[in-house]
Each structure stands twice: as C-alpha cells, then as structure tokens.
Amino acid sequence: MKGAILLAAGSGTRYHARKQDLIFHDKPLWRYAYETAFSVVGEGNIVAVGKDIPGGETRTESVKIGLAALSEKVDRVIIVEAARPMVTREQIEELLKDPHPSSTFVRPLVNTPIYRDGTYVNRNEMYDLLTPQAFDRKMLQEAYQSGRFDNMTDETRVMFEYYDIRPHFIETESNLFKVTYPGDLDILESIYRTLEEKQ
C-alpha cells in the first residue's frame, strides 16, 4: 500500500512567517501538495504533520512522527513538503511506482556552487536534490529507529548512511520550486499560471 507524509510543521524562519499557512489563490499553501498527494494515495493513507497531528522540533522528528502515524499496511511512502505546493499528481505517481527503496527528484545545478573556504565545485558533477522523495517505509523507519540520525535535512542521506543505498535520481521539471523567502511568491505565481495553461 502507498502512503504519504506531508511536512507542514515548519516555523518559516527565513520567510519570517509560517509560509505553509499563507493564502495563495484563496487556499492555504499547504493544501496544494496535500490535495495532490491525497488524490493519489487516498483517504487514510496520508498524514499532514503539523496539521493532522503536531510536528516535531526538527524535520527529522516530524518525519519520524509521520512514519509512526501511517497505517502499518503502508509499505512505500512518499514525503512531500508543504513549501513545494506545485507538485503534480504525475510526479507523485512516478515516485511511488519506482521500485527503488530510495527515490528522489533532482535538477541539474544552474549556478556554480562554492564552499565557504573559497573552493569551487564542478556543477556538472552535482544535482540539486528536491522533494517529493519516496522510500521503502520499513527500511526508512528502521534507519530512524537506530537513533543515529537526529537532525537530517534529507531522507536519501539517511538511507545512504544506514544502508549504503544510493538514491535513484529522477530528473524533473522546475515546478518543484520551494517557497523560502517572501519574494518567492512571484515565482510561484508564474509556475502556477504555467501549470494552469497546460491543463
């Protein structure tokens, strides 16, 4: 059975507000990703951490809470972020159908990354990791229950460090933009209009 966890408990430090609760086209931002995921996994197979149940102090805690709240029948879980509201049904279906135990959407880097010490990195050898991401639910839960991972920002890293499993990278479109700063709503509006025109 397929299940979904929506992460909607963030404090919005960089946005200076709880961005998941912002009203965008007459609807709270978090509802977009929630409704899209719901349309795929169905009633009873999705938990909105921060809405249906309280979230944790960190992303890691919120993911653990979400995993524990899902039905035991869920064997593959997709983790969706409220701050990426324009995820499509097709993208969620693609991840859930992928048999790999750790799957993630990626985009090629468009800017050249640099370490704080001034060391440059070849962007052609790197990806920008995005969400949603999908996992073997039992494996991810076991990794977190090991107690080795307290403050992770990405579950593919948990799977890699615990099982030595490299994620399956799936290149995707730019619609998985993450709302982070106040000015990002203008970019989101552009993506929203583009998706509306495609329908």
Where are these regions (language model features)?
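N-terminal glycine-rich phosphate-binding loop and ensuing alpha1 helix
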Residues: 1-51
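Conserved hydrophobic helix-helix packing surfaces used for dimerization/oligomerization
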Residues: 2-4, 77, 167
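Residue-level signal for inorganic ion chemistry
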Residues: 6, 30, 66, 81, ...
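Glycine-rich beta-strand-to-loop/alpha-helix junction loops that act as flexible
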Residues: 8-11, 56, 182
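Glycine/serine-rich anion-binding loops at beta->alpha junctions
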Residues: 11-14, 82-86, 133-134, 180
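Short beta-strand-to-turn element immediately C-terminal to the catalytic PLP-Schiff-base lysine
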Residues: 24, 114-116, 178-180
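Conserved beta-loop-beta/alpha segment of the NTase-like Rossmann-fold superfamily
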Residues: 53-123, 130-131
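Conserved alpha/beta core of the MobA/IspD/sugar-nucleotide pyrophosphorylase nucleotidyltransferase superfamily
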Residues: 128-199
